[in-house]
Amino acid sequence: MGSRPHNGFTLIELIIVIVILGIVAATAVPRLIDLTEDANLAAVRTFAANFEKAANDAHLRWQIAGAPGRIQNMPGFGDGTLDMSTNGWPLGTNKGNANDNVGRGSAGCHALWNYLLVDGPRADADTSQDFQSYRHSGNTSCSFVYRANGDTAARSAAKLGVLYNSISGSVSACGTQTATSC
């Protein structure tokens, strides 16, 4: 009588394979997390660039109109409801007053974001959208904190966002993953 052929793996072989798979998984997961954070940063930088382009387009339209100072309901841009600051930067839509504050109250920033980025991610004053908007710095700046990544931190501690200054027209990515605070 001969010996039977050996089918399958021994317990030791299975344990070795499981340990090796565990080591591979332990080294791969942090790299995947880093890739996710990098992808979110790239997405926010893209949204910031799109917002900046839209603000620059509105500013150019204001310059073509002769740089007339503060405008309510600027004709020739979008549906004609965009309001421009004294310096020619977007302030909001249908503000109804001639001050240089961004928008109407807390809704001003997300109304401006949603107007300029028609096909982009949405913003709101709460966490129900991809971006949560905040009006601050004397009501002349907006921060749009990226919430699609699950971040629940306050504006000043947010991981990622977009910062807009209606006095200078500057737009930048912000957050703890960048060098700029939101």
Regions found by a protein language model. Name each.
Residues 34:
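Phosphate-coordinating loops and pocket residues in cytosolic domains that bind phosphorylated ligands
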Residues 7, 13-16:
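Internal alpha-helical transmembrane segments of multi-pass membrane proteins, especially GPCRs
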Residues 39-69:
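Membrane-proximal N-terminal amphipathic helix
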Residues 1-9:
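N-terminal leader/signal peptides at the extreme start of proteins
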Residues 20, 37-40:
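Amphipathic alpha-helical protein-protein interaction surfaces
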Residues 63-182:
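Periplasmic/extracellular, small/polar-rich flexible segments of pilin-like filament-forming proteins
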Residues 15-30:
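Alpha-helical hydrophobic helix detector
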Residues 1-2, 19, 57:
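Short, contiguous, well-ordered secondary-structure segments
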